[in-house]
Amino acid sequence: MKANMKMVGRCMLAVIAVCGAAPSLAQSGERVAVFTKNQTNPFFQAVRLGADSAAKQLNAKVTHYVPTKPDSIPEQMSQVEDVIVKKPDAIVFTPVDYKAMVPAVAKINGAKIPVVNVTDRSDSGSFVAFVGASDYKLGLETGRYLIKAMGGKGNLVVLEGVKGALTSIDRVRGLNEAVKEAPGIKLLASQPGNYQRLQALQVMENLMQSHPKIDGVFAANDAMAAGAIEALDGANRKALVVGINGTKEAIDAIKAGKMLATGDYNGFMQGCMAVMTAVRDLRKLPVQKEIVFPATVIDKTNYQQGETPVESRSCPKWEDAVKT
């Protein structure tokens, strides 16, 4: 009888050991498909690197899907359809167009694949969480900063993003609210540069031909701010320039005195938190339904915080990240 009890005891210990090991085996190697809008905007490269860092920390696997043509609706739709067939464990999704990609979100939802919406908030759909920042507040605070530096007066031009893109709409809306607060500011023009450096350069060159005196430039992202600076340098003209995204290129321009400031969009951290949220949800750990980073402005007084190249950064632990 004692021998039998010992055998039962050994069997129970074996079962406990196997059961105890099962969760750890299950809690690794999750496959996460990450969708971003293009390969031309340094911001989205920061998002992808943040996603990679989070995956490494959590022992998950990330695959990136990026349209070869920037912001291509048909291409992203095709990529979504291909990914659904592959059945990843989760998807992190930035729609190239917040309205046009709603059918893609519906297909993901229909396939029962959990999805985290990051950066550009989708017009509709079912999501584990949203991770991003308030584009309106970034536009407002960066606009206020520019106007204050202009002394509350002078001529201002705006370089908008992609026409119809919610990020551009909200950032420009925030800037316009800041302009309303400053009666001494004259808004000369507001034209799209489609979030592209070269297009912004060309738009800025045309604006300088039409307007002999431009005191300030509000660019809806850092790439367009860089284009505006290049145009100003080429014409040997001066103006205060701000952008949004907090990219390394913008930090370098601020450090060099070429750019006034940039609104920090926290691209690396958006990638970190989006993948962390997706993986934690798969592991049945608590997640936050909304993770919205505060609107902060990076200038010559605090640019040091963004000097570390995104390639050299690591995601913080979840517990530390949600405290900030």
Where are these regions (language model features)?
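Bacterial N-terminal signal peptides that target proteins for export
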Residues: K2-M12
